[in-house]
Amino acid sequence: MKGKKNITLVAEEGASLSSGSLRLYALPYGAVDLYGYDPLNRRAAVGIMVAREFRRQGYALAMLHALEELSTANYQIHTLFADIATPNAASIALFAKAGYSQCGLFRDWLVVKEQYVDSIRMQKILK
């Protein structure tokens, strides 16, 4: 990544996390999702999608950092987590680089190309 990427996350008009999930766009780079929101325990799951032409350029990491800032400032979220298919080495590396640590393993949890694969859970406790 050359230089720090400044990312602005934008939700669709009228969207809120009160429904349990929220998609935020970082156009033209991609989008991040908060889902499975648990307001009592102040945690949510994270999903991320990066447009193919912007991959491996630091945008995903910048999007995660922007999501973390928004999560603490707007929703008082304490913990973010992601469930990642074990064959997805790029995603595992991204979340590790962002400071997430592995906290669980789910056997035969996801179907990828018609095959069951394990999934790891990675989490980050936000300050």
Predicted feature residues:
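Conserved GNAT acetyl-CoA-binding A-motif
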Residues: 73-83
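Acetyl-CoA-dependent GNAT
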Residues: 1-55, 125-127
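Terminal substrate-recognition subdomain of acyl/acetyltransferases
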Residues: 115-127
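Conserved catalytic-core motifs of GNAT/GCN5-like acyltransferases
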Residues: 81-84, 101-118
